[in-house]
Amino acid sequence: MNGFSPYQTGCHVLIADGLKGTDETLVPVNGEYVKEAKIGSAIMDADVFISLTHFKGHETAGFGGTIKNIGMGCGSRAGKMEQHCEGKPSVATEACIGCGACGRICAHGAPVITDHKAKIDHDKCVGCGRCLAVCPKDAISADYADSVAMLNYKMAEYSLAVCQNRPCFHVSLICDVSPNCDCHPENDIPILPNIGMLASFDPVALDQACADLCNQATPVESSVLGKNIAHAHEHHEECDHDHFHMTHPDTCLLYTSPSPRDQRGS
């Protein structure tokens, strides 16, 4: 979908968790939310880990940076499900038209149409949120306050599982800063101008630096971010200085500018 093949990259492409997503290594992490991360075996077989990240907005995580790329990207299919399993959506029956789009997009058969209304089986649902994106009536919603917080906690602990006890290096590209995740086959125009390439041995420092630069940049006026800011000004609403929170207010992630001590690198 995103063009990662030997023909485009000029090198071999390995699917880290195998052809069916079941080739995984259980990595002890002893986190608060994850005790044993399910990581694609090819990732854990590597002596050195190098990540390359496209920094962008994200409709659930706030922004997609190095930590999200490592934590979610290196998880096996079961690992991805474990990270997504909070904040399961529900259907507002009065708004549902029974079109079945949610059922067709779901890989787990969670949405079921009964009497022309959809209902989501939470025992089957993994909380991936695809059904929210395809509903033509916005009849599906999730408790984002819980799901966003838990998703970010788990991604951080999965990233620790990948990076601990071996040499790591991380590169992040701040270009074509799309409002949504690259998982989608489509996207909107970039919310920010191209900024450049950053690199670090520390994934947390790298994400912080990328967020700092993005929040210092002038938004693209015709983007969803630019329109949200214009709408806030027009209606005399409070305008958040966090560009990613302004793009996706439901993420509940608020940017904290670095202190002078942090900016000096001390």
Identify the meaning behind each predicted range.
Residues 1-64:
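An acidic, phosphate/nucleotide-engaging active-site surface
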Residues 5-8, 35-45, 59, 74, ...:
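Solvent-exposed alpha-helices and their adjacent loops that cap or buttress functional pockets
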Residues 28-38, 69-78, 83, 88-91, ...:
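Active-site glycine-rich loop that binds ribose-phosphate moieties when present
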Residues 74-133, 139-147:
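Ferredoxin-like iron-sulfur electron-transfer modules
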Residues 112-114, 142-146, 219-250:
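Flexible, glycine/charged-enriched surface loops at secondary-structure junctions
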Residues 133, 137, 142-153, 167-198:
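Conserved mixed alpha/beta catalytic, RNA-binding, or beta-rich assembly cores of soluble enzyme
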Residues 187-236:
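A hydrophobic, small-residue-rich beta->alpha segment in the mid-to-C-terminal subdomain
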Residues 255-260:
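Conserved small/polar residues in nucleotide/adenosyl-binding loops
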